[in-house]
């Protein structure tokens, strides 16, 4: 397996929750972590300090133009890129008959559109160094029917399809894989329905951000022969 020491990896949505755990996990592996954030500047600065002063990159991922500008800056300042972790995402609940066009666009603009344009720009930078690794964070919602999260589930199913398509399009120099987390609570007062879902898994508990980070590290270190794959880190949730 590859070593991550000294390799430059960008994590989107790195200020909080799973993104924070991924950034810290990559820093522990010796990677040169780049931290993207949207609005959570204070939290992003805290993660930066924990990652040895990791560079911060702010961008509104709803805008392909801002994504291009962010990667152009990375190219100027870092010279290249080894890895991209497309983690930034939005999650909302709404009955299916109440989902508006604005609700749909709010989710898909970040959960799917931004994943594509970040991967596109990252691939350009990775080409300078002979290749790289892209890891997209999907969700078990891509595979399970969650009736009050239809717009979210559709976006994450799109991430799975996008991962497979990109894996073919960018081979053999760039591998593209996905991690699909199960129940990973971060709020002190988590939704009772989510708590119940976590208890019903074969693992009998929710997962942790660190467990998702471990899966991301695996794909970033894996041989480029591993590509187009989706690793479900869900405590067996998908077996129900």
Model-assigned labels for residue ranges:
Residues 8, 15-17:
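Conserved glycine-rich cofactor-binding loop
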Residues 95-96, 103-108, 134, 189, ...:
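Substrate-binding pocket helix/loop in short-chain dehydrogenase/reductase
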Residues 119, 155, 163:
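Active-site helix of classical SDR
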Residues 124, 168-172:
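Alpha-helical segment proximal to the catalytic Tyr-Lys
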Residues 139:
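Residue(s) in the substrate-gating loop at a strand-loop-helix junction
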Residues 171-175, 227-228:
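Short, small/polar-rich loop/turn modules that mediate ligand/substrate recognition or access, typified
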Residues 208-233, 238:
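C-terminal substrate-recognition "lid" of short-chain dehydrogenase/reductases
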